[in-house]
């Protein structure tokens, strides 16, 4: 009988499908376990083996927890709204829905071939109207809570592309796509008030079993700062407020800097400086925020022609404008303290502004007394408290907590996204759609390009945009913006609890049974955006009594990157492995050019992704699953090797041959059971500790030891096969039946460990002569002293020849020493 994974795997995948083996049920008699992957965007490129690391890990845990008696929810769906499908539609005219459905079908085929134990009955895509019906409803809930509003925002606009770009899509004032000029413009946008939840989002991190680096990234992104607002009265009419956390440096202020987009800038600028300031503002608005705040850029700026009075000394401070100050941080006004801030120092040196040192090397205030303001000798919190009290007593400032976090710009000028369910009227008012008007479907259009500045592609469908609103009896216009891709992923984990409820996004009963997600695995690239946005939505739902937990994801693991060899011709780009060869240690392209070889993250753009289907056809899914774990710790970067998959296939061949051999007998063999119980103990420990990369090596060690036994216990092998199932389910199902068990290994309980099999039955004595190690002796644990001494003499007989033993030292279960 020969191991044929292609035959076996298809057979058992069909069995699982027919028997709905992995259907999740709300069983009140069982403890629940919800294990979830960050669901994928179904791209046209399909999956490569790098994607399978996390999916294999969650599947191992799901199968293990089922075997331990848990009621397990392990679903999969599709984060299917997104820019790539829309860009493809712009190029080809193919509706994004068609492209998305085709890509989903390919993804499902790839995942099914891996034998993942998903509850397929809960599958959905975020672009399904039945799903985004509820995304729209939840947006309106946020709107009703006062957390969704419209405001003018400065955005990156590319006239050539006809669309707004994110900061990540702009570099040095040009679009990354196409290299076109980008300018900053004010645009009316939908915004979510995530800042209202800044403190709760910070506090909630403490109770989460998440990687510390992810929690720190979120803390930094929220950026809570305790400080004060300091008032600087202008020499002309008005004043400016600057936020600072370094109140101890107040007497070191020698200038103020205001952001180019500050709303009060126009009233501050003198007529003599207006043209120069206007030109500078226009120039700065062509830069992305990332470029403006870069620490490596040369500081630029223009004097506004105005001065402010120092709140303590009354000294006149020049007010400058510079693009290194951004309106979204603090108040958009920075008090320049060049002696104690690197960026301020660079600016001061560029424009020859004064530098006043007011803090010594020990952090103590110096040169900081003025009349009744006495700061010298103070430091740290004591100095901070003194300054705040002084300012507040004189109405010159007040304590203030500020956040780096800004409200979430939520609208997009895209077609392939959830239409925002709002109707606008001529008088400037608007109304949210009511329940009977949802879902709001997008119109069918032929041209998916944006419709000029401030208009999304939906604006092209005039018959869809301009309507007579029967609810109010007025003409109105539908919102032409759509939601970002993040919208659908903000709450998808809740929909999996109750995936096909047509009356509610989820029922209270099912949500309270399944939530929170017990284990969430995905890439570290989502550390801030997706994970922060979903936590925000969830906390809003919790405060409103819609969910039972304050946090959605109890434990988070970020899988490491999968690296593979990439081949690049300098100055030209990447080539595939099929187009290179190695000659005397140098890699050459088929065109004869020298190729650079690097270990880089698998990606379509680098042409180094490995198609899992190719490996499945050659080695089988179980071998691929084993190597996906064996390649390295789950949370670490790892280098991929197709040869490693072959090694796991050879192990499975040996294991299959052993279980199907004639030496397998229905007997109680202690040696075999000892090995089996030790294996169960180790695999249990590996999974509980998420040390999944050590599972294959434990099985290989077991196989090596077990194969040396004179006879193979069927009971011992059944135990081994049962604990192999989480990582290699297809071969385990097959061998389970061959060993005489009923089909459906997932219905069998995890083997119970008998501690008596884990206790050693023998002990090893160190045998010494005159204190020097001369041999070792393994005997039964209960062997009497005289027997141990007699056997020990035999072990070191050559060292005892022609010698008289003067003393025999015996340490039970450890040592025998013959003193001559």
UniProtKB/Swiss-Prot annotation:
Residue interval(s) of motif 'HIGH' region = 40-51
Q: Which reaction is the catalytic activity of this chain?
A: tRNA(Leu) + L-leucine + ATP = L-leucyl-tRNA(Leu) + AMP + diphosphate
Name the InterPro entries for this protein: aa-tRNA-synth_I_CS, aa-tRNA-synth_Ia, Leu-tRNA-ligase, Leu_tRNA-synth_edit, M/V/L/I-tRNA-synth_anticd-bd, Methionyl/Leucyl_tRNA_Synth, Rossmann-like_a/b/a_fold, tRNAsynth_Ia_anticodon-bd
Keyword vocabulary terms for this entry: Aminoacyl-tRNA synthetase, ATP-binding, Cytoplasm, Ligase, Nucleotide-binding, Protein biosynthesis
Its EC number(s): 6.1.1.4
Q: Which domain of life is it from?
A: Bacteria
* An example Gene Ontology biological process: leucyl-tRNA aminoacylation
Q: Which Pfam families match?
A: Anticodon_1 (PF08264), tRNA-synt_1 (PF00133), tRNA-synt_1_2 (PF13603), tRNA-synt_1g (PF09334)
A Gene Ontology MF term for this entry? leucine-tRNA ligase activity
Identify which top EC class this enzyme belongs to. Answer: ligase
- Where in this chain does the entry annotate a coiled-coil region? none
- Predominant subcellular localization, coarse grouping: cytoplasm
Membership in a protein family: Belongs to the class-I aminoacyl-tRNA synthetase family.
Q: What name does UniProt use for this protein?
A: Leucine--tRNA ligase
**What is the species listed in this Swiss-Prot or TrEMBL entry?**
Chlamydia pneumoniae
């Amino acid at each position: 009988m020969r191991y044929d994974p292609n035959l076996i795997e298809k057979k058992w995948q069909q069995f699982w499908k027919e028997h709905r083996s992995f259907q999740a049920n709300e069983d009140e008699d069982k403890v629940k376990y919800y294990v979830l992957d960050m669901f994928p965007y179904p791209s046209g490129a399909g999956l490569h083996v790098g994607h399978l690391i996390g999916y294999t890990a969650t599947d191992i845990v799901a199968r293990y927890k089922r075997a331990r008696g848990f009621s397990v929810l392990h679903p999969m769906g599709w984060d299917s709204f997104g820019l790539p499908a829309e860009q493809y539609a712009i190029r080809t005219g193919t509706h994004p829905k068609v492209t998305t459905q085709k890509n989903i079908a390919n993804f499902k085929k790839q995942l099914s071939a891996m034998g993942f134990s998903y509850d397929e009955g809960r599958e959905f895509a975020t672009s399904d109207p039945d799903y985004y019906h509820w995304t729209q409803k939840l947006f309106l809930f946020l709107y009703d809570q006062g957390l969704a509003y419209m405001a003018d925002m400065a955005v990156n606009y590319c006239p050539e592309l006809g669309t707004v770009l994110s900061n990540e899509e702009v570099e040095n004032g040009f679009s990354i796509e196409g290299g076109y000029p980008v300018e900053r413009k004010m645009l009316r946008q939908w915004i979510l008030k995530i800042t209202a939840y800044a403190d709760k989002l910070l506090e909630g991190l403490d109770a989460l079993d998440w990687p510390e680096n992810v929690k720190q990234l979120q803390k930094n992104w929220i950026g809570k700062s305790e400080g004060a607002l300091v008032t600087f009265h202008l020499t002309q009419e008005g004043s400016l407020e600057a936020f600072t956390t370094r109140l101890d440096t107040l007497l070191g202020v020698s200038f103020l800097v205001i952001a180019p987009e500050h709303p009060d800038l126009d009233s501050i600028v003198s007529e003599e400086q207006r043209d120069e300031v206007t030109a500078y503002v226009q120039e700065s608005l062509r830069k992305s925020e990332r470029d403006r705040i870069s620490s490596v850029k040369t500081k630029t700026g223009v004097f506004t022609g105005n001065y402010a009075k120092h709140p303590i000394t009354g000294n006149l401070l020049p007010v400058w404008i510079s693009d290194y100050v951004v309106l979204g941080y603090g108040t958009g006004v920075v008090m320049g303290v060049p002696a104690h801030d690197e960026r301020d120092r660079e600016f001061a040196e560029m424009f020859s502004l004064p530098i006043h040192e007011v803090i010594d090397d020990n952090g103590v205030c110096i040169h900081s007394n003025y009349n009744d303001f006495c700061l010298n000798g103070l430091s740290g919190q004591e100095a901070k408290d003194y300054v705040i009290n002084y300012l507040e007593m004189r109405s010159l400032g007040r304590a203030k907590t500020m956040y780096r976090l800004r409200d979430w710009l939520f609208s997009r000028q895209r077609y392939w996204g959830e239409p925002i369910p709002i109707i606008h009227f001529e008088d400037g008012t608007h109304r949210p759609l009511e329940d009977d008007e949802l879902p709001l479907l997008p119109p069918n259009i032929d041209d998916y390009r944006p419709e000029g500045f401030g208009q999304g592609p939906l604006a092209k469908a005039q018959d869809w945009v301009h309507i007579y609103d029967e609810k109010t009896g007025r003409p109105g216009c539908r919102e032409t913006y759509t939601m970002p891709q993040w919208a659908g992923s903000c709450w998808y984990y809740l929909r999996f609890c109750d995936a096909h409820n047509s009356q509610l996004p989820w029922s209270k009963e099912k949500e309270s049974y399944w939530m929170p997600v017990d284990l969430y695995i995905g890439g570290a690239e989502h550390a801030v955006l997706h994970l922060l946005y979903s936590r925000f939505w969830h906390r809003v739902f919790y405060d409103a009594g819609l969910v039972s937990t304050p946090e959605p994801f109890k434990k988070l693991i970020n899988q490491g990157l999968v690296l593979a060899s990439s081949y690049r011709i300098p100055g030209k780009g990447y080539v595939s492995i099929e187009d290179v060869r190695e000659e005397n240690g140098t890699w050459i392209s088929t065109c004869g050019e020298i190729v650079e070889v690097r270990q880089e993250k698998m990606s379509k753009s680098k042409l180094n992704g490995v198609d899992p289907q190719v490996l499945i056809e050659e080695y089988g899914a179980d071998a691929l699953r084993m190597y996906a774990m064996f390649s390295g710790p789950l949370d670490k970067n790892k280098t991929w090797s197709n040869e490693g998959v072959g090694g796991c296939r050879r192990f499975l061949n040996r294991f299959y041959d052993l279980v199907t051999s004639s030496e397998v007998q229905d007997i109680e063999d202690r040696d075999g059971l000892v090995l089996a119980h030790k294996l169960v103990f180790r695999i249990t420990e590996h999974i509980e500790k998420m040390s999944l990369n050590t599972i294959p090596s434990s099985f290989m060690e077991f196989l090596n030891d077990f194969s040396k036994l004179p006879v193979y216990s069927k009971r011992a092998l059944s135990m081994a096969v049962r604990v192999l199932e989480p990582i290699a389910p297809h071969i385990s199902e097959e061998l389970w039946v061959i060993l005489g068990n009923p089909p459906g290994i997932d219905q069998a309980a995890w083997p119970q460990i008998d501690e008596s099999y884990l206790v050693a039955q023998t002990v090893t004595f160190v045998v010494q002569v005159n204190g020097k190690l001369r041999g070792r002796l393994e005997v039964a644990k209960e062997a009497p002293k005289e027997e141990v001494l007699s056997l020990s003499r035999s072990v070191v007989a050559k060292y005892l020849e022609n010698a008289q033993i003067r003393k025999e030292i015996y340490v039970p279960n450890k040592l025998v020493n013959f003193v001559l």
